Structure formats: structure tokens, C-alpha cells
């Protein structure tokens, strides 16, 4: 008889495979699902899921949580709904790379797509990063969700071209510089 860390008993399991849901149990060991079905075993913690749905965490492929993650590392607007992985940096928006003179320009782009005012963004984003890697370092070790962030093309253009990024096409030299900044970011 196997002993698990967690045993979720009697829930309706939606496993993400596309197959119909089924009543069963989920065994977790060392933070990973190790078995599903009708499980005869013991656990340090048993969760009664009778009448409840059980599923893997959801992935939100389209978020603008780049700023919010700095003051809300649980991403409560997502994790309270079963989301365990978020992908910020969508629609070309990301907080980094960003030079100090461009910070308000970048924050204003978030104000336009999020229901967060510019004063709230200014108060919530504690700058201390310029590069995308430094932004990721600012998040590291604090998050309650998995984060796989994209490098926003608007931030990349602003980083290389400044205000000209919204006025004209990039030159071949600027495109080359953007490629180098992007390579350093991923």
C-alpha cells in the first residue's frame, strides 16, 4: 500500500486529454501527480473532493500581468480561477527592456490595455531593472504561479529607438540592435 503526500479522493477528474471526465482519485508525491483512478493508499493529507471537479492547473496564454506580478506575485486574478501558469508580455507590451526615460511611456501602454491607472502603476512598479533579465530577476523566488514571459516588441522598439519607435519604421541598424537585445533577453 503506497503512502503519498496528498491524496485527493472521489472527485470528478477532468484530465485535459479530451476524454470524458470520470470519478476517481489523484495521488501527489513530491509536488507531482503520480497516479489517478481508484487509488488504495494512504497519505499525509487526504482531501475529500466528493461533488467537486479536479483538474490540472490551467495555462492563461494571454495576460498583461507584467506589472501586477511585481505587487501581486500570486496573480490572484488568475490563480483563484485555477490558473497555474501565466504568459505575460502579450500584445507587444512588456515592462522590459526599458530605459529610465521611457518608463512612463511603457506604463502608459499598460494603462491603455489594463484597468489600472497610471498613478497606481507608478506606485506598484518598483523599477530597479532595465533589461528583461533584470525584470525576471525581480520576480524570481516570489511568484505563486508559473510565469513564462514574452519580450514585448513595443518595449523592444522603444528601448532601441526611443520616441521614434511610434513615428517611423526601424532602420536596418536598429533592427540588428533589436535582435541583439532580444537574444540577450531569452
Predicted segments, located by residue:
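Histidine-rich, glycine-flanked metal-binding segment
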Residues: 2-7, 13-57
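Activation segment
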Residues: 17, 37, 67-69, 87
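Short capping/connector residues at structural and topological boundaries
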Residues: 18-19, 59, 70, 161
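Di-metal (Zn2+ and/or Mg2+/Mn2+) metal-binding site signature of metallo-dependent hydrolases
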Residues: 53-77
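Divalent-metal coordination cores built from histidine and acidic residues
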Residues: 71-185
Amino acid at each position: 500500500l503506497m503512502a503519498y503526500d496528498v491524496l485527493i479522493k472521489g472527485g470528478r477528474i477532468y484530465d485535459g486529454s479530451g476524454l470524458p471526465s470520470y470519478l476517481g482519485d489523484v495521488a501527489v508525491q513530491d509536488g507531482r501527480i503520480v497516479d489517478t483512478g481508484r487509488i488504495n493508499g494512504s497519505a499525509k493529507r487526504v482531501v475529500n473532493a466528493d461533488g467537486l471537479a479536479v483538474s490540472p492547473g490551467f495555462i492563461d496564454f494571454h495576460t498583461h500581468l507584467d506589472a501586477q506580478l511585481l505587487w501581486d506575485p500570486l496573480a490572484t486574478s488568475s490563480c483563484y480561477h485555477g490558473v497555474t501558469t501565466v504568459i505575460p508580455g502579450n500584445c507587444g507590451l512588456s515592462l522590459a527592456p526599458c530605459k529610465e526615460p521611457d518608463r512612463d511611456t511603457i506604463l502608459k501602454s499598460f494603462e491603455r490595455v489594463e484597468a489600472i491607472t497610471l498613478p497606481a502603476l507608478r506606485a506598484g512598479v518598483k523599477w530597479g531593472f532595465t533589461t528583461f533579465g533584470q525584470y525576471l530577476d525581480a520576480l524570481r523566488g516570489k511568484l505563486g504561479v508559473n510565469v513564462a514571459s514574452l519580450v514585448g516588441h513595443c518595449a523592444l522598439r522603444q528601448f532601441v529607438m526611443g520616441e521614434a519607435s511610434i513615428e517611423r519604421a526601424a532602420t536596418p541598424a536598429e533592427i540588428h540592435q533589436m535582435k541583439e537585445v532580444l537574444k540577450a533577453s531569452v
